[in-house]
C-alpha cells in the first residue's frame, strides 16, 4: 500500500453542482460519499476528495493531478444553469427533468476506464456495476492510502492482462470476461490507441469503437459521451427507450438537441430512473 500526500485547495463552484446527483446519475460508478462527509472521486491515476463547506465553497484535496484536471473532469467550463434555461419550454417532461436534475454535470472521464466499465455494464444494474468495477480495481489496481482512506486505482491494460480468466470471472464479469480480455490485450499491445481516437470526429470515433468485441451502440455512445466528451451522442438504454416510448410517442427526440443531446439524455435518464424507483418503493 503506497501512502500518498494530498494537495489541498479551497475552490468555489457557483454553477449547478450537486455531488449526490452526479454520483447517482448513472455515468460514473466509483465516486462515493464517505462517512466523514467527503466525496471521493477516482479517474485514471488521479484521486480527489471534495468537502462541501457551504455557499459553493469546497475543500479540494487531490493526488496525481492538479485542479485543472478536475475542473475539466466536472465540465466546469460549461454553464449548466444557462444550458437548462436554454432547453426549457420544449416539453413539460423535459422541464420537469431539468428542474429535478439541477446540479447534474456530464463528467469527462478516462476513456480506458469508460470502455471497460461500460463493457461490464451490459445487463447489469447500477449497484451490480459498481460492485464488479470495485472488485476489478481491488483485484489488480494500484493500492493507495491517503489521509487514512485506502483506495485502489482503476487497472491499467497491462494489469488486466496479468489476470487469469478465473480471476476475472471472480470479479463478477460473467460472459463479459472475454470482452475485457480482448480490450486489455489490444490496448496493451498498442493495437487499440484510445488516446489517438480523440482526434476522430464523432461518427468515426463511434464506428471505431463498434469494431471492438462486445461493443454495441449503447456502449459506444456511452464511451463517446463520458470518455471523450462528445455531447452530441445520446446513449439509449432500457430506461431511455422506455422514456422514448412513454413520453415521446416512440420518436427519438435526441437529434433535435444537437450538441446538447448527451447532456439532455442525462437529465432525462436521472429523472426517469429516480421517479420510477420512487414509485416502486411506495408500492
Task: Briefly describe each language-model feature range.
Residues 1-283:
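HhH-family (HhH-GPD) DNA N-glycosylase catalytic core used in base-excision repair
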Amino acid at each position: 500500500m503506497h501512502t500518498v500526500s494530498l494537495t489541498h485547495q479551497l475552490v468555489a463552484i457557483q454553477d449547478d453542482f450537486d455531488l449526490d446527483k452526479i454520483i447517482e446519475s448513472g455515468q460514473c460508478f466509483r465516486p462515493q460519499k464517505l462517512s466523514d462527509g467527503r466525496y471521493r472521486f477516482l479517474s485514471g491515476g488521479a484521486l480527489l476528495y471534495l468537502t462541501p463547506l457551504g455557499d459553493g465553497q469546497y475543500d479540494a484535496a487531490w493526488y496525481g493531478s492538479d485542479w485543472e484536471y478536475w475542473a475539466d473532469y466536472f465540465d466546469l467550463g460549461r454553464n449548466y444553469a444557462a444550458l437548462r434555461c436554454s432547453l426549457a419550454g420544449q416539453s413539460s417532461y423535459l422541464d420537469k427533468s431539468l428542474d429535478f436534475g439541477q446540479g447534474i454535470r456530464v463528467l469527462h472521464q478516462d476513456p480506458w476506464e469508460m470502455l471497460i466499465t461500460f463493457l461490464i455494464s451490459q445487463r447489469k444494474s447500477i449497484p451490480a456495476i459498481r460492485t464488479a468495477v470495485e472488485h476489478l480495481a481491488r483485484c489488480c489496481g494500484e493500492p493507495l492510502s491517503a489521509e487514512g482512506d485506502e483506495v485502489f486505482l482503476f487497472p491499467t491494460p497491462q494489469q488486466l492482462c496479468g489476470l487469469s480468466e478465473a480471476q476475472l470471472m471472480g470479479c463478477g464479469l460473467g460472459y463479459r470476461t472475454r470482452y475485457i480480455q480482448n480490450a486489455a490485450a489490444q490496448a496493451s499491445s498498442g493495437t487499440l490507441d484510445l488516446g489517438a481516437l480523440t482526434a476522430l470526429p464523432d461518427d468515426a470515433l463511434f464506428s471505431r469503437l463498434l469494431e471492438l468485441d462486445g461493443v454495441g451502440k449503447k456502449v459506444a455512445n456511452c464511451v463517446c459521451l463520458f470518455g471523450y466528451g462528445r455531447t452530441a451522442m445520446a446513449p439509449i438504454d432500457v430506461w431511455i427507450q422506455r422514456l422514448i416510448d412513454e413520453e415521446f410517442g416512440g420518436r427519438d427526440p435526441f437529434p433535435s438537441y444537437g450538441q446538447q443531446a448527451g447532456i439532455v439524455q442525462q437529465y432525462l435518464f436521472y429523472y426517469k430512473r429516480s421517479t420510477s424507483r420512487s414509485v416502486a418503493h411506495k408500492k
